[in-house]
Every structure is written in C-alpha cells, then in structure tokens.
UniProtKB/Swiss-Prot annotation:
Molecular functions (GO terms): microtubule binding
Location(s) in or outside the cell: Cytoplasm, Cytoskeleton; Cytoplasm, Cytoskeleton, Microtubule organizing center, Centrosome; Cytoplasm, Cytoskeleton, Spindle
Claim: Cytoplasm is one of the keywords in the record: yes
Phenotype of the disrupted gene, per the record: RNAi-mediated knockdown results in multipolar Class I dendritic arborizing neurons forming a bipolar morphology. Dendritic arborization is unaffected.
Spans annotated as Disordered: 186-205
Protein name: Nuclear distribution protein nudE homolog
Record keywords: Cell cycle, Cell division, Coiled coil, Cytoplasm, Cytoskeleton, Microtubule, Mitosis
GO cellular component, one term: nuclear envelope
PANTHER family xref list: NUCLEAR DISTRIBUTION PROTEIN NUDE HOMOLOG (PTHR10921:SF1), NUCLEAR DISTRIBUTION PROTEIN NUDE HOMOLOG 1 (PTHR10921)
Length: 317
C-alpha cells in the first residue's frame, strides 16, 4: 500500500481521499459482482456434480457385480494353490525359526522395559526432590524479599521519625519564643504558656472527676445539665467570634502587621460586646466553676488566635 502524498491544503486532501474512496468502492462492486458470478457458477457445478454422482453410483453397482464374478474365479484359483503345498511347508519351517527369534526379542524387550521403569522411577524421585528444593528456594527468596521490605520500611520510618522530631523541636522553640513575647491588648495581657498550662490543668482536673467538682474545699455533685449548657454557650460564642474574625480579616487584609495588631483588639472587643461569651446563668457552685473554666479557655483561644496568627506549616509528605 502506497503512502499518501503531501497536501497543500485541506481541500486537496479531501479531494484525494474522496477519489480513493470512489476507487475502492468501484473495486468493491467489481469484486462483489465476481463473487456473485462465482456463487452462481458454484451452484451450477453442484448440480452437475450431483448428476455425475448418480452416474458414478450406477457404475459402482456394475463393478460390484463384476467383483462377485471375480470372486468366483478366485475360488477356482484356490484349487490351483493346493499344488504349492510343498512350498508352504518350507515356508512354515522358516516361520518357526522367525518365531524363535521373536521370543528371544520379547525377553530382551521385557528386560529393557524393566530397566526403563527403574530409570523412570529414579527420574520421578529426582524431579520430586528438585521440586522440593525449588519450593524451599522460593520460600527463602520470599522471606528474603520480606526482610528487605521490612528493612526499607524501617529506614523510611526512621527518616520520618527524625523529621517529626526536628519539626517538634522547631515548634517547641517557636512556642517558647511566642510565650516570652506576648503583647498586651486593651490593658489586658494575653495568657502566656504558663497560664495556658494552668487553665488546661484545671480543665483536666475538673474533667478527671466525672461525679463531682472541688469547690470551696468541698466535693460537690456535678450538675450535668449546667455543664452541657455551659459547653453549648461556649461553642456558640466561639463560632460567632470566629465568623466575626473572618469578616475582619477579609476587610483588613491589606493592612500592615502593626495596624492589624492595634485594630484587632478593638474589633474583637466590639464583637465580644455584641455577643457575650458568658451570659449570666444562675447555677450552683459546680455549674459556675464549669462556666468559668470554659469561658476562660474560649477567651484565651480567641485572643491568641486573633493576635498571633500562627503560620501553617507544610505537612510532612
């Protein structure tokens, strides 16, 4: 099949392929016409072959009749064969000698078959031992591959652990630096790391007592309804403050860091005044203690997240 020539334009290419398609269609029609003629001729030949088959069958019948006649002639010839009996006796003697040779060859063949069976048995045992050795070798290869994979995984885990330790050390250093340089907002200092640890320890100590909270030196039964209400109030206040902080960040995204540090406390104070974090709820001593702890924790989280804005570190891949 010849390769298509280079074309100067799409119209030339379309014209070329249209001509080729017409040519192929014409060839297809010619071939189809020839095929139809061939089918018609084959049908005619089939009819002729059927006629010749009938003729041949009649000829076969005639030949069978002749065969029966020749068989009768053969029987007459058998009578002539009896005269050759002497020759047949000689041939029988020779046949006896051949039979003896055949018996000796049978014995030798039987011995060869026994030897062949022994060799096949030994070969089968050898193949089984080879298969066992191959299975043991495959198991050893698999065990070696698993050990190599474990070694590689151990190396990757060690590298990942080292990266995590380095990142933990950097985060600790950054936290120490931020805890040393905490700014003052509207005359109120932001809780430092020690204050955070104090609040967390108080929350943990209160959470570690499921049936009671220490208040004024006495163990008081915990009010589940008041604690649930305080938690919902704190979460709602946190959500409202976070929404207000997002709106503030969108409006003042082009300001400098110094202006942002001065404006955020005022914006947060206005939002805090509009949405009180801890509404006045008259509860028992246990409820007030839970409300105060939850409120302190929410206030510290909001102030620290608005002022400092910690950078998001890239996750370890």
């Amino acid at each position: 099949m010849e390769s298509p020539p280079m074309f100067n334009s799409v119209e030339d290419e379309c014209r070329y392929w249209k001509e080729r398609s017409k040519q192929y269609h014409k060839e297809w029609t010619d071939v189809k016409q020839e095929y139809d003629e061939f089918v018609e001729q084959s049908r005619e030949m089939e009819i002729e072959m059927d006629a010749t088959l009938d003729q041949k069958q009649s000829i076969i019948k005639d030949l069978t009749a002749k065969l029966t006649m020749f068989e009768r002639e053969n029987e007459s010839l058998k009578l002539k064969l009896e005269s050759h009996g002497i020759d047949m006796s000689n041939m029988e003697k020779q046949l006896e000698t051949v039979k003896k040779d055949r018996d000796t060859m049978k014995v030798y063949l039987r011995q060869l078959e026994q030897k062949n069976d022994d060799l096949e048995r030994a070969h089968r045992i050898l193949n089984e031992s080879i298969e066992n050795f191959e299975k043991m070798l495959d198991q050893a290869y698999e065990k070696n591959a698993l050990l190599e994979l474990e070694v590689d995984e151990k190396g990757l885990l060690q590298e990942k652990l080292q990266r995590l330790m380095d990142e933990t050390r950097d985060l600790k250093q950054e936290l120490n630096v931020k805890s040393r340089f905490t700014p003052v907002v509207n005359g109120t200092s932001v809780p430092t790391a020690n204050d955070t640890n104090t609040v967390n320890s108080s929350m943990n100590s209160s959470a570690s007592l499921p049936n009671g909270i220490v208040a004024n030196g006495e163990l008081v039964k915990h009010d589940n309804a008041v604690a649930t209400r305080a938690t919902s109030v704190s979460v709602n206040a946190l959500n409202g403050s976070l929404v207000n902080r997002n709106e503030y960040n969108q409006q003042h995204s082009l300001k400098s860091d110094g202006d942002e540090t001065e404006d955020v406390p005022r914006e947060w104070s206005a939002n805090a005044a509009a949405t009180p974090l801890l509404p006045a709820i008259h509860t028992s001593g246990a409820g007030r203690t839970a409300l105060l702890l939850a409120g302190c924790r929410v206030v510290w989280i909001l102030q620290f997240s608005v002022i400092h804005k910690p950078q998001i570190r890239n996750p370890i891949t």
